[in-house]
From Swiss-Prot:
It comes from Thermotoga maritima (strain ATCC 43589 / DSM 3109 / JCM 10099 / NBRC 100826 / MSB8). The keyword Isomerase does not apply. Part of the ABC transporter complex RbsABC involved in ribose import. Responsible for energy coupling to the transport system. It comes from the Bacteria. The lineage of its organism: Bacteria, Thermotogati, Thermotogota, Thermotogae, Thermotogales. The keyword Signal does not apply. ATP binds at residues 45-52. Its EC number is 7.5.2.7. It is an enzyme of class 7 (translocase). This is Ribose import ATP-binding protein RbsA 2. Belongs to the ABC transporter superfamily. Ribose importer (TC 3.A.1.2.1) family.
Length: 523
């Protein structure tokens, strides 16, 4: 994707010598950045490299910083995001800033609602405008539905629609595909190309390097708060980008030891999960088994029901779940997550920040929470053995290489990769028989991913049964021994790893309605 010289000369935004410090940390260190009109500029780097902080400065989230910002040649300093938006800069943050109890349309037009001559909000007009935005994005979302009732991927599309509604000159996308599937990603890329053709610019942050090579014109690499590389995308390959991002070459990215697979340890039969109104099956009669030392991968597109399947097994939806669960050949009854934990089942959820961690608690207390529930560190009279608690946490901080100043650090202050290690540590501490992993590497950098893969491999070698949901085909193929495919809540296929290709998995994952449409077009 070569930029023409005209666009190359037209600088839309320039940030000069930007430095941003937090107590004890230089998050952005003397970074200069140019954004050209009508380009897609990728910004890459590990978690903690300073990417999101730099973008929040450009978008007015952080008004206090050193350096200068020029927009179309004029110096600007935004005091808040609204000022940035009024000047044509929109940010889609990694952590979505949506209001759960408002509808998707109300979120899109929050504080910008269409009103009549009397100042009364014209809801019908707002719903129609939201529908047009969703149609442009190629997604089927009811503009009247509350955000809290939408899936994570649908919420992501609402955030993207909100940014498009601002008609910005520069749209900053921070990990926009971390929670959406392949089809939605392709649609988003089409939108990005349209924006580019309109002369608008996109700053695109992603850990998925294959996306960078597909959509970007230019790439900027950050490490430890500094800019360490920059240039047209044609000047980079995967290895060069990784080397710049982590400061060294990664010879082996997917670390999968060959574990000894023995007896069946876990089986589910006829799992069903009904919607809240009990009119629709979100999971429809799914059965599978896992053996000791085995990693069972579950692949599917967004809306396939994979997350719902794991949650149903874990007892997260009592009253709406049917089916049987067996551990070691013995049927167990799970009516709540507590029942699952007591029977040796752990769940690493897709959204670690809201479902996997208590962000305002320390690393120590997050790691030992299930151990307290299981009374593994509780002495007589219900008192916690604080010495044992500290020893357990220190051992996991060391074993999992969790980068934290101390066990008492608030977990919200850790990087995404280290937060995910804390979630894994809290389950490993109770020595589960089965661990359910839902998108275990979502939103974390390449180095942290490699460490998570190593941990998953070690779990399998130890004899644990591992069930791993992933939307990343290279990941599912590299880490799984067997792969189950889901579509529209149903199990559609099952493969041995050595007998399947990416094409096989995608074919099995496409919903039947889409397959029919595709066949008709071909005819």
């Amino acid at each position: 994707m070569m930029l023409n010289t005209e666009k190359e000369r037209e600088v839309l935004l320039e940030a000069r010598n930007i430095t941003k410090t937090f107590p004890g940390v230089i998050a952005v260190n003397n970074v200069t950045l140019q954004i050209y009109k009508g380009e897609v500029c990728a910004l890459v780097g590990e978690n903690g490299a300073g990417k999101s902080t730099l973008m929040k400065i450009l978008a007015g989230v952080y008004p206090d910083y050193e350096g200068q910002i020029f927009l179309e040649g004029k110096e600007v300093r935004f005091r808040n995001p609204r000022e940035a938006q009024e000047n044509g800069i929109a940010l889609i943050p990694q952590e979505l800033d949506l209001v759960p109890n408002l509808s998707s349309a109300e979120n899109i037009f929050l504080s910008r609602e269409p009103v009549n001559e009397f100042g009364v909000i014209e809801y019908q007009k707002m719903f129609e405008q939201a529908s047009k935005l969703f149609s442009k994005l190629g997604v089927n979302i009811d503009p009247k539905t509350k955000v809290e009732d939408l899936s994570t991927s649908q919420q992501q599309m609402v955030a993207i629609a909100k940014a498009l509604s601002l008609d910005a000159k520069i749209i900053i996308m921070d990990e926009p595909t971390s929670a959406i599937g392949k089809r939605e990603t392709e649609q988003l890329f089409n939108i990005i190309r349209s924006l580019k053709n309109e002369g608008k610019s996109v700053i695109y942050i992603s850990h998925r390097l294959e996306e960078i090579f597909e959509i970007a014109d230019r790439v900027v690499v950050m490490r430890d708060g500094r800019k360490v590389g920059e240039g047209p995308i044609e000047e980079f390959d995967h290895d060069k980008l990784v080397r710049l991002m982590v400061g060294r070459s990664i010879d082996q990215f997917f670390i999968k030891e060959r574990a000894t697979i023995t007896d069946e340890i876990f089986r589910v039969e006829g799992i069903k999960l009904w919607s809240l109104d009990r009119k629709k099956l979100l999971v429809d009669d799914v059965s599978f088994y896992v053996r000791k030392g085995e990693v069972l991968g579950i692949y599917g597109l967004v809306g396939a029901g994979r997350t719902e399947l794991l949650e149903a097994i874990f007892g997260a939806h009592p009253g709406r779940t049917e089916g049987k669960v067996f551990i070691g050949g013995k049927e167990i009854k799970i009516h709540s997550p507590r029942d699952a934990v007591k029977n040796g089942i752990g769940l690493v959820p897709e959204d670690r920040k809201t479902a996997g961690l208590i962000l305002q608690m320390s690393v120590l207390h997050n790691i030992t929470l299930p151990s307290v529930v299981m009374k593994l560190i509780v002495r007589k009279f219900g008192l916690i053995d604080s010495q044992l608690e500290k020893e357990i946490v220190r051992s996991f901080i060391e074993k999992l290489n969790i980068k934290t100043p101390s066990p008492y650090q608030i977990v919200e202050n850790l990087s995404g990769g280290n937060q995910q290690k804390v979630v894994l540590a809290k389950w490993l501490a109770i020595k589960p028989k089965v661990l359910l992993l839902d998108e275990p590497t979502r939103g974390i950098d390449v180095n942290a991913k490699s460490e998570i893969y190593k941990l998953i491999s070690e779990m399998a070698v130890s004899g644990m049964g591992v069930v791993m949901v992933s939307s990343e085909l290279p990941e599912i193929l590299a880490m799984s021994d067997r792969i189950l495919v889901m579509s529209e809540g149903r199990k559609t296929a099952e493969f041995l790893r050595e007998e399947v290709t990416e094409e096989d998995l995608l074919k099995a994952a496409i919903p039947r309605s889409v397959k029919v449409e595709t066949t008709q077009r071909e005819e």
